Amino acid sequence: MLIIAAATLGPDPEDMIADLFEECTHLQVYDGDTEKLVEVIERNGKSDVQLGQILADMWAEALICGPLKQDVFDIVAADEYSITRYNGVGMPAAIALKAALEYKLDVIRDPIDGIGCMGHFIDQHDD
């Protein structure tokens, strides 16, 4: 299963991607092969780092979100996990998922006010 998560302002596919990762209230977890929502993780007081580690532990392939702070960026962008980060700000999760699968979203290469990585990105296209 190709796991793609979306950092959103609610639990439903129609809910918007949060403007900043730190503002998300939910992580929606999709099967990228079927585009079906398979799990919703509520923030419920979890820190950005805890959410990032949840994504790493589930071996997510991609995260659709807004800009990330350095601490969580370091987790999801680590060579060990190499979670591709797509900027889906301004879009509902379901639309952002389709756009990510069609390589129509920009990759987030750097954290907020920090130095990112060149990293490895899944099937990246420079269209």
Where are these regions (language model features)?
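Proline-aspartate-enriched helix->loop->beta-strand connector
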Residues: 59-63
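Short, glycine/polar-rich helix-capping loops at beta-to-alpha or helix-loop-helix junctions
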Residues: 68-75
